[in-house]
């Protein structure tokens, strides 16, 4: 915890959420006292960080963890092999499988072939085409759930003409999100209206999904008021390793033509997206999905505060920042929930992004196995998978 907080080091926290830690004391062998600089009722959620020995030299080559499996080997761009850890601390939740191999499948067109040939026993995030190819195959069970991420056309609020709220609102009114779902996922998925998805339950505001129902005439009027009566050109940057996002961008390109916006897709490597779009913020718009690392409202909404290093869309709203500071120190759960809902509503009202959906997640599992589970966060819990034949 001290290392995560930067205590006894150079003061730089390894984990941003731990920057609030003032000191750590151990009064006895079964107790740890953590003192915070200011109240933070969500801090417990951030204690789910990995426990890693201080002097581990190469975590990439020799990972250290505390889970039900232990690391065996890794072949870059090929596979990662894990085996059951017999000394796992949670004796009531031991893994069923003795060995798990994660294979890298570079060609999405080869997924179904690999499943049917026996090379793969399981594959997550099937496309609608892949699901259709496996639907009648009794050798596989298809599990349906939410992907638990916020897919959107993320807009750089600091560049023209997207720095004009009316332009951003026009884009939102121009889109037909149900058509996006129908065309890329056979209608599966949940339309959303802000940076929150249904699995977060009490924080989620479902009515925001209807805030920008398609209205072409209203979109044109907003563009006219913003000074773009004839539309404008828009570049949509998309990482080339996510076919669902590419497909979504292609549908949006066609829809935006109705209001005079000429959009073009720029596909980039994932590393380039991380450096140029996410880190350097050199983009106009991008279609990606953003998920949460923790089960807190802050996990999805903190990134849009004006000073956050994760605020890659350059969103800036003084009221939003004030609400965030307020929710950080609130100790009343009901008040926290209401504040987070206000923050979601501001993102929607400001059309910070063109929110689309929490994408459907379909998982193929060979019928020899069972036990697959969906969680509010995107994880692959292999410890729950067991063999039935």
What feature does the model see in each segment?
Residues 32-34, 67-70, 79-81, 97-104, ...:
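Short, well-ordered beta-strand elements
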Residues 109-119, 133-137, 166, 247-259, ...:
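Short helices/loops that flank or line small-molecule/ion binding pockets
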Residues 2, 29-31, 67-68, 96-99, ...:
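Alpha-helical secondary-structure segments
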Residues 190-225, 243-245:
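Structural transition elements
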Residues 29, 42-99, 107-109, 217, ...:
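Gly/Pro-rich hinge or "lid" segments in bacterial periplasmic/extracellular proteins
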